[in-house]
């Protein structure tokens, strides 16, 4: 029996905020490795999802770089997020531009298209939400964007339902170069369990508080230790910028933070495969977004 070729390559997933990048990465990997939210700019740092593909002649490992959404930066944190996004595209074997044709305004894509058009990487256009978008406007948008950037391929998918994703995954695997795998077969992300735990809690903050809580919040790790019975004890700090936000996070009688903790604990237990004891508390720090330690904790470079 002929031994299968080993292939390994990098795919950067770019797009405007809230285009569905993290949802698509989770679909390609086959499980949650990136947090998702209806709130834009949920992803803050580059995170790698690791997807596997096997064909008749090859076994392929695709390293998916889930990047922060690219937008006009205003704060130091914004600048670091946009910088991380473009760094994620460097040296990639393919760059996916994911576009939400339902919510995305055409003019919002212009700076991204302008920056992308002269880049040397193989560029692929992915139009999301085919499950809800109308066909004719979708095709017209694809043609319009292709006139701006020389896309090698165009795919129509639904990151939410998975429609069109297997076909795109097959095509991406075919593009990857021959080479040894960079990660063990059972590894699905480069994120440490400690970072993943803070990301899962942050996802619940966004999902449960919706528009009530602005972006000036973070989740910081405090303790992460294994108990004698094999379970994990995790302590985290929810950092907010103003005292007036504390009751929003806590809820009446502590009901909101309890619900956030319960949902995050359940997700973590399922992902890590062990019982998790999660303890959350709230801290007010008006200048947390200027704290170098916070940047390091969430995997962002400190930028001026």
UniProtKB/Swiss-Prot annotation:
Residues 41-45 are annotated as: G2. It is a peripheral membrane protein. Residues 128-131 are annotated as: G4. Signal peptide: none annotated. GTP binds at residues 15-22, 66-70, 128-131. GO terms for biological process: ribosomal small subunit assembly. Residues 66-69 are annotated as: G3. HAMAP family: GTPase_Era (MF_00367). Monomer. This is GTPase Era. It comes from Erythrobacter litoralis (strain HTCC2594). The lineage of its organism: Bacteria, Pseudomonadati, Pseudomonadota, Alphaproteobacteria, Sphingomonadales.
